Amino acid sequence: RQRQMCIRDRLYQMGLNGTETILIHSSMKAIGDVEGGAETVLDAWMEYFKEGLLLLPTHTWKTVNESHPVFDSQKEPSCVGVLTNLFMKREGVVRSLHPTHSMAGFGKHAAEYLAGEEYRNTPCTPGGCYDRLKDAGGKILLVGVGHERNTYIHSVEEVLNVPNRLSDKPVKLTVVWPQGQRDVYMRKHYNPDQPHISEDFVKLTQAYTDCGAAKNTVLGSADCILCDAAKVFDVTRHVLAPEPECLVTRERIEKERWADYISVSYTHLR
């Protein structure tokens, strides 16, 4: 059985020093048997990143919609895993007010980082919590999941204005928090040919690895991917530039799409 110290040691071995701004997408099942279960995992993460900013997604897109248009930040459960639900209830953790793609944070400037999400009108609006990861020198750790769960790539597509990613018609939703409420007109993820856009993000897995934007690692029994947000943005922009919709329209992305990126990066490093 894994212990809290083992988890912290693994984070250190990944090259993380605890002062990072880091977003973690996770599968508790993939992590495996931990002494104390999910609470121990959270204890380890919160202790390790107490001098940084620890972020977990607390999405509600599965439940907050036309038939249930109210997002109560204090009550609405997350639809993206047990760790996210336990995390957002912990003392010192702040949850953003985005009605469908909220995020919870713990650590330095968490409230400041998460502020203003009730004014967003798309899932990962430019200038929002996801987009600003790249400007914060942020990392993304995928624990037991792949890039199909890497919400940050949605934000990259929004910044790049990739066509056919959002619904034309917004949905009226109401955000409720202890100090008030606000109506929001939210566009949703939508593509006429691919109902689950993020499933195609895995087509960029090799590109991210080859270009130094991501590296494979492990945490417990879980295969993990540690990403650099700014580099993920750059590589995605480079690959999509000639053909913005290629993730959906092509079965696979050929290596030629990023070979010149590696060449330019290597020349720059020299």
Model-derived segments and their meaning:
Residues 2-9, 267-270:
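Conserved small/polar residues in nucleotide/adenosyl-binding loops
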Residues 4, 38, 122-123:
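A conditional alpha-helix N-cap/helix-loop micro-motif detector
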Residues 12-21, 133-135:
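Glycine-rich phosphate/diphosphate-binding loops that line cofactor/substrate pockets in enzymes
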Residues 17-67:
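N-terminal active-site beta-alpha-beta segment that forms phosphate/nucleotide-binding
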Residues 47-53, 89-95, 162-172:
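Structural alpha-beta junctions
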Residues 65-154:
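Internal, conserved structured core segments that host functional sites
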Residues 114-217:
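Glycine-rich, aromatic-bearing surface loops/beta-hairpins
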Residues 190-269:
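Acidic/aromatic/glycine-rich contiguous surface patches that form carbohydrate-binding/processing clefts
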